[in-house]
């Protein structure tokens, strides 16, 4: 890959894991270069001002951690918020072009699967049986009792790679 440079990266469209959101929901798309203070200023202003009752922080790749951080800060500053978290992988398509045109190399397109997170914070009660629900006042990481469909998937057996 030393003879290639990245020409661009495109996140392929995917459906939201939370399609049933009310129309007044504030959707905060967190990017790698987003400033946390700007994101928090808008989200806290709308929540505390009463113009919205729901905020969704979403981020993929390196921005996933920043989206979770924003949600945790908002939960700490606005008491009584219900939380619903969804995780999934998104496809990203990277384009690579040769660094010098006379090498005879073709342009490349690479598809990657990157982790993504959506965190819904709501003043209104949410369905506690939903996978990823966390009630107000619960310490981070300690949500409701998971239903059997929410637990981790069974691990696959490791393949024997010895020859």
Curated annotation (Swiss-Prot):
It holds the Pfam family Alba. Residues 153-163 have a biased composition (Basic residues). The keyword Repressor does not apply. It comes from the Eukaryota. Residues 1-24, 126-163 are annotated as: Disordered. Its main location: nucleus. GO terms for molecular function: nucleic acid binding. Keywords: Nucleus. May be a component of ribonuclease P or MRP. This is Ribonuclease P protein subunit p25-like protein. It comes from Mus musculus (Mouse). The gene is Rpp25l.
